[in-house]
Protein backbone atom coordinates (compact mmCIF):
# COMPACT_ATOMS: atom_id res chain seq x y z
CA UNK A 1 0.00 0.00 0.00
CA UNK A 2 1.35 3.43 -0.96
CA UNK A 3 1.94 6.22 1.54
CA UNK A 4 -0.99 8.44 2.47
CA UNK A 5 -1.49 11.14 -0.16
CA UNK A 6 -2.17 14.55 1.41
CA UNK A 7 -3.36 16.22 -1.80
CA UNK A 8 -6.99 14.92 -1.82
CA UNK A 9 -7.44 16.24 1.73
CA UNK A 10 -6.17 19.76 0.93
CA UNK A 11 -7.78 19.98 -2.52
CA UNK A 12 -11.06 18.60 -1.19
CA UNK A 13 -11.18 21.23 1.54
CA UNK A 14 -10.32 24.13 -0.78
CA UNK A 15 -12.84 23.04 -3.42
CA UNK A 16 -15.54 22.54 -0.76
CA UNK A 17 -15.06 26.05 0.65
CA UNK A 18 -15.20 27.53 -2.87
CA UNK A 19 -18.44 25.70 -3.67
CA UNK A 20 -20.01 26.65 -0.32
CA UNK A 21 -19.37 30.37 -0.86
CA UNK A 22 -20.97 30.24 -4.29
CA UNK A 23 -24.20 28.50 -3.25
CA UNK A 24 -24.81 29.51 0.37
CA UNK A 25 -27.92 31.73 -0.14
CA UNK A 26 -29.69 28.77 -1.78
CA UNK A 27 -28.79 26.58 1.19
CA UNK A 28 -30.24 29.18 3.55
CA UNK A 29 -33.58 29.22 1.70
CA UNK A 30 -33.64 25.41 1.84
CA UNK A 31 -33.26 25.50 5.63
CA UNK A 32 -35.98 28.15 6.04
CA UNK A 33 -38.38 26.16 3.82
CA UNK A 34 -37.73 22.91 5.68
CA UNK A 35 -38.34 24.26 9.19
CA UNK A 36 -41.58 26.12 8.42
CA UNK A 37 -45.04 24.58 8.85
CA UNK A 38 -44.26 22.49 11.95
CA UNK A 39 -47.56 22.03 13.80
CA UNK A 40 -45.85 21.19 17.11
CA UNK A 41 -43.63 24.30 17.22
CA UNK A 42 -45.44 27.65 17.38
CA UNK A 43 -42.30 29.55 16.39
CA UNK A 44 -42.07 27.76 13.04
CA UNK A 45 -45.77 27.00 12.44
CA UNK A 46 -46.35 29.89 10.03
CA UNK A 47 -45.82 29.28 6.30
CA UNK A 48 -43.76 32.38 5.52
CA UNK A 49 -42.29 31.34 2.17
CA UNK A 50 -44.07 29.97 -0.92
CA UNK A 51 -40.91 28.71 -2.55
CA UNK A 52 -37.21 29.28 -3.06
CA UNK A 53 -37.44 32.52 -5.07
CA UNK A 54 -40.08 33.97 -2.74
CA UNK A 55 -37.86 33.10 0.24
CA UNK A 56 -34.82 34.76 -1.35
CA UNK A 57 -36.75 37.94 -2.12
CA UNK A 58 -38.56 38.12 1.24
CA UNK A 59 -35.46 37.44 3.33
CA UNK A 60 -33.49 40.03 1.36
CA UNK A 61 -36.26 42.63 1.65
CA UNK A 62 -37.19 42.09 5.31
CA UNK A 63 -33.84 41.14 6.83
CA UNK A 64 -31.34 42.63 4.40
CA UNK A 65 -29.02 41.05 1.84
CA UNK A 66 -26.54 40.23 4.61
CA UNK A 67 -29.12 37.83 6.06
CA UNK A 68 -28.74 35.61 2.98
CA UNK A 69 -25.32 34.71 4.38
CA UNK A 70 -26.52 34.03 7.93
CA UNK A 71 -24.40 31.15 9.20
CA UNK A 72 -21.67 31.44 6.56
CA UNK A 73 -18.89 31.31 9.19
CA UNK A 74 -19.78 27.87 10.60
CA UNK A 75 -20.56 26.72 7.05
CA UNK A 76 -17.01 27.62 5.98
CA UNK A 77 -15.63 25.94 9.09
CA UNK A 78 -17.76 22.89 8.34
CA UNK A 79 -16.43 22.58 4.81
CA UNK A 80 -12.86 23.10 6.02
CA UNK A 81 -13.32 20.05 8.25
CA UNK A 82 -16.06 17.95 6.62
CA UNK A 83 -14.98 18.54 3.02
CA UNK A 84 -11.32 17.93 3.79
CA UNK A 85 -11.92 14.66 5.65
CA UNK A 86 -14.63 13.45 3.24
CA UNK A 87 -12.64 13.66 0.01
CA UNK A 88 -9.32 12.67 1.56
CA UNK A 89 -10.81 9.61 3.26
CA UNK A 90 -12.76 8.59 0.15
CA UNK A 91 -9.71 8.72 -2.12
CA UNK A 92 -7.51 6.99 0.47
CA UNK A 93 -10.02 4.17 1.02
CA UNK A 94 -10.31 3.60 -2.74
CA UNK A 95 -6.53 3.23 -3.04
CA UNK A 96 -6.60 0.85 -0.08
CA UNK A 97 -8.92 -1.52 -1.97
CA UNK A 98 -7.85 -0.87 -5.57
CA UNK A 99 -4.47 0.43 -6.70
CA UNK A 100 -5.36 1.70 -10.17
CA UNK A 101 -8.24 4.18 -10.74
CA UNK A 102 -9.24 2.46 -13.99
CA UNK A 103 -9.98 -0.75 -12.04
CA UNK A 104 -12.51 0.91 -9.72
CA UNK A 105 -16.00 -0.57 -9.55
CA UNK A 106 -19.31 0.94 -8.43
CA UNK A 107 -19.77 -1.33 -5.34
CA UNK A 108 -16.28 -0.53 -4.01
CA UNK A 109 -16.76 3.19 -4.60
CA UNK A 110 -20.17 3.14 -2.86
CA UNK A 111 -18.69 1.43 0.21
CA UNK A 112 -15.83 3.94 0.34
CA UNK A 113 -18.30 6.81 -0.09
CA UNK A 114 -20.54 5.61 2.74
CA UNK A 115 -17.62 5.15 5.14
CA UNK A 116 -16.05 8.51 4.35
CA UNK A 117 -19.42 10.25 4.66
CA UNK A 118 -20.10 8.79 8.11
CA UNK A 119 -16.60 9.53 9.44
CA UNK A 120 -16.39 13.12 8.17
CA UNK A 121 -19.94 14.15 9.11
CA UNK A 122 -19.64 12.78 12.64
CA UNK A 123 -16.48 14.77 13.30
CA UNK A 124 -17.89 17.98 11.79
CA UNK A 125 -21.39 17.77 13.34
CA UNK A 126 -21.05 20.77 15.75
CA UNK A 127 -20.39 23.11 12.82
CA UNK A 128 -23.50 21.78 11.09
CA UNK A 129 -25.64 22.46 14.17
CA UNK A 130 -24.24 26.00 14.36
CA UNK A 131 -24.94 26.65 10.69
CA UNK A 132 -28.56 25.50 10.85
CA UNK A 133 -29.30 27.39 14.09
CA UNK A 134 -27.89 30.61 12.60
CA UNK A 135 -29.72 30.11 9.29
CA UNK A 136 -33.01 29.61 11.13
CA UNK A 137 -32.73 32.93 12.98
CA UNK A 138 -34.75 35.76 11.47
CA UNK A 139 -33.63 39.37 11.55
CA UNK A 140 -30.41 39.95 13.50
CA UNK A 141 -28.23 36.96 14.30
CA UNK A 142 -27.65 36.77 18.03
CA UNK A 143 -23.96 36.92 18.87
CA UNK A 144 -22.24 35.51 15.80
CA UNK A 145 -20.63 32.08 15.52
CA UNK A 146 -18.77 32.07 18.86
CA UNK A 147 -21.77 33.52 20.72
CA UNK A 148 -24.12 30.92 19.25
CA UNK A 149 -21.63 28.15 20.00
CA UNK A 150 -21.38 29.20 23.65
CA UNK A 151 -25.16 29.60 23.87
CA UNK A 152 -25.76 26.05 22.64
CA UNK A 153 -23.08 24.63 24.93
CA UNK A 154 -24.31 26.49 28.03
CA UNK A 155 -27.99 25.67 27.51
CA UNK A 156 -27.76 22.18 26.02
CA UNK A 157 -24.29 20.92 26.85
CA UNK A 158 -22.04 18.83 24.63
CA UNK A 159 -25.08 16.82 23.63
CA UNK A 160 -26.52 19.90 21.91
CA UNK A 161 -23.46 20.23 19.66
CA UNK A 162 -23.92 16.67 18.45
CA UNK A 163 -27.69 17.06 18.09
CA UNK A 164 -28.88 15.01 15.12
CA UNK A 165 -25.49 13.36 14.60
CA UNK A 166 -27.07 10.01 13.69
CA UNK A 167 -29.21 11.67 11.03
CA UNK A 168 -26.28 13.72 9.80
CA UNK A 169 -24.23 10.55 9.45
CA UNK A 170 -27.12 8.79 7.68
CA UNK A 171 -27.58 11.70 5.29
CA UNK A 172 -23.85 11.91 4.63
CA UNK A 173 -23.71 8.16 4.01
CA UNK A 174 -26.49 8.54 1.43
CA UNK A 175 -25.17 11.72 -0.20
CA UNK A 176 -21.50 10.74 -0.33
CA UNK A 177 -22.36 7.10 -1.07
CA UNK A 178 -24.34 8.29 -4.10
CA UNK A 179 -22.64 11.48 -5.33
CA UNK A 180 -18.96 10.52 -5.37
CA UNK A 181 -19.43 7.05 -6.93
CA UNK A 182 -21.92 8.42 -9.50
CA UNK A 183 -19.44 11.16 -10.42
CA UNK A 184 -16.54 8.72 -10.73
CA UNK A 185 -18.49 6.14 -12.74
CA UNK A 186 -20.12 8.74 -15.03
CA UNK A 187 -16.76 10.37 -15.69
CA UNK A 188 -15.12 6.98 -16.29
CA UNK A 189 -17.74 5.84 -18.81
CA UNK A 190 -17.77 9.16 -20.67
CA UNK A 191 -14.00 8.98 -21.11
CA UNK A 192 -13.77 5.25 -21.92
CA UNK A 193 -16.65 5.48 -24.41
CA UNK A 194 -14.69 8.02 -26.41
CA UNK A 195 -17.58 10.50 -26.31
CA UNK A 196 -15.59 12.99 -24.25
CA UNK A 197 -12.07 13.40 -22.96
CA UNK A 198 -10.90 14.27 -19.47
CA UNK A 199 -12.02 17.87 -19.90
CA UNK A 200 -14.00 20.48 -17.98
CA UNK A 201 -17.09 19.51 -20.02
CA UNK A 202 -16.86 15.93 -18.75
CA UNK A 203 -16.44 17.20 -15.20
CA UNK A 204 -19.46 19.48 -15.66
CA UNK A 205 -21.79 16.74 -16.94
CA UNK A 206 -20.63 14.19 -14.36
CA UNK A 207 -21.07 16.63 -11.47
CA UNK A 208 -24.54 17.68 -12.67
CA UNK A 209 -25.62 14.03 -12.77
CA UNK A 210 -24.30 13.22 -9.31
CA UNK A 211 -25.93 16.35 -7.86
CA UNK A 212 -29.38 15.28 -9.08
CA UNK A 213 -28.90 11.72 -7.80
CA UNK A 214 -27.75 12.98 -4.41
CA UNK A 215 -30.70 15.36 -4.00
CA UNK A 216 -33.30 12.69 -4.80
CA UNK A 217 -31.75 10.20 -2.40
CA UNK A 218 -31.09 12.51 0.53
CA UNK A 219 -33.94 15.03 0.76
CA UNK A 220 -36.24 13.13 3.21
CA UNK A 221 -33.35 12.55 5.61
CA UNK A 222 -32.30 16.17 5.17
CA UNK A 223 -35.74 17.48 6.19
CA UNK A 224 -35.82 15.38 9.37
CA UNK A 225 -32.19 16.22 10.17
CA UNK A 226 -32.80 19.95 9.78
CA UNK A 227 -35.85 19.88 12.06
CA UNK A 228 -34.10 17.80 14.70
CA UNK A 229 -31.04 20.07 14.72
CA UNK A 230 -33.16 23.21 14.96
CA UNK A 231 -35.08 21.80 17.94
CA UNK A 232 -33.87 22.95 21.36
CA UNK A 233 -33.11 20.33 23.99
CA UNK A 234 -32.54 21.36 27.61
CA UNK A 235 -29.88 19.84 29.85
CA UNK A 236 -32.50 17.73 31.64
CA UNK A 237 -33.39 16.14 28.33
CA UNK A 238 -36.86 17.65 28.06
CA UNK A 239 -38.04 18.48 24.57
CA UNK A 240 -41.21 20.24 23.47
CA UNK A 241 -41.10 18.97 19.91
CA UNK A 242 -40.08 15.57 18.53
CA UNK A 243 -39.00 12.74 20.80
CA UNK A 244 -36.63 11.30 18.22
CA UNK A 245 -35.81 11.01 14.53
CA UNK A 246 -38.46 8.37 13.84
CA UNK A 247 -41.07 10.47 15.67
CA UNK A 248 -40.05 13.48 13.58
CA UNK A 249 -40.35 11.47 10.37
CA UNK A 250 -43.76 10.05 11.28
CA UNK A 251 -45.17 13.35 12.58
CA UNK A 252 -43.99 15.20 9.49
CA UNK A 253 -45.59 12.59 7.21
CA UNK A 254 -48.81 12.40 9.28
CA UNK A 255 -49.35 16.14 9.84
CA UNK A 256 -48.03 17.54 6.58
CA UNK A 257 -48.19 14.67 4.09
CA UNK A 258 -45.55 12.53 2.35
CA UNK A 259 -44.33 15.33 0.11
CA UNK A 260 -43.40 17.35 3.21
CA UNK A 261 -40.35 15.08 3.24
CA UNK A 262 -39.40 16.73 -0.05
CA UNK A 263 -39.78 20.26 1.27
CA UNK A 264 -36.91 22.31 0.00
CA UNK A 265 -36.16 19.82 -2.81
CA UNK A 266 -35.76 22.46 -5.51
CA UNK A 267 -33.36 24.63 -3.54
CA UNK A 268 -31.68 21.41 -2.38
CA UNK A 269 -31.13 20.28 -5.98
CA UNK A 270 -30.45 23.78 -7.27
CA UNK A 271 -27.81 23.99 -4.56
CA UNK A 272 -26.36 20.48 -4.95
CA UNK A 273 -26.19 20.87 -8.73
CA UNK A 274 -24.15 24.10 -8.79
CA UNK A 275 -22.32 23.06 -5.60
CA UNK A 276 -21.10 19.84 -7.19
CA UNK A 277 -20.25 21.57 -10.46
CA UNK A 278 -18.17 24.23 -8.68
CA UNK A 279 -16.63 21.64 -6.37
CA UNK A 280 -15.60 19.03 -8.95
CA UNK A 281 -14.43 21.53 -11.58
CA UNK A 282 -12.32 23.27 -8.91
CA UNK A 283 -11.07 19.95 -7.52
CA UNK A 284 -10.10 18.62 -10.96
CA UNK A 285 -8.20 21.83 -11.75
CA UNK A 286 -6.38 21.69 -8.41
CA UNK A 287 -5.37 18.08 -9.19
CA UNK A 288 -3.57 19.33 -12.29
CA UNK A 289 -1.30 21.61 -10.27
CA UNK A 290 2.31 20.43 -10.25
CA UNK A 291 2.95 20.38 -6.50
Curated annotation (Swiss-Prot):
It holds the Pfam family Mito_carr. One of its GO terms (biological process) is inorganic anion transport. Belongs to the mitochondrial carrier (TC 2.A.29) family. This is Kidney mitochondrial carrier protein 1. PROSITE patterns: SOLCAR (PS50920). Antiporter that transports inorganic anions (sulfate, sulfite, thiosulfate and phosphate) and, to a lesser extent, a variety of dicarboxylates (e.g. malonate, malate and citramalate) and, even more so, aspartate. The sulfate/sulfate exchange is much higher than the phosphate/phosphate and malate/malate exchanges. The transport affinities is higher for sulfate and thiosulfate than for any other substrate. May catalyze the export of sulfite and thiosulfate (the hydrogen sulfide degradation products) from the mitochondria, thereby modulating the level of the hydrogen sulfide. Its main location: mitochondrion. It catalyses: sulfite(in) + sulfate(out) = sulfite(out) + sulfate(in); thiosulfate(in) + sulfate(out) = thiosulfate(out) + sulfate(in); sulfate(out) + phosphate(in) = sulfate(in) + phosphate(out); oxalate(in) + sulfate(out) = oxalate(out) + sulfate(in). It comes from the Eukaryota. It is found in: Mitochondrion inner membrane. GO terms for molecular function: solute:inorganic anion antiporter activity; transmembrane transporter activity. GO terms for cellular component: mitochondrial inner membrane; mitochondrion. Interacts with VDAC1.
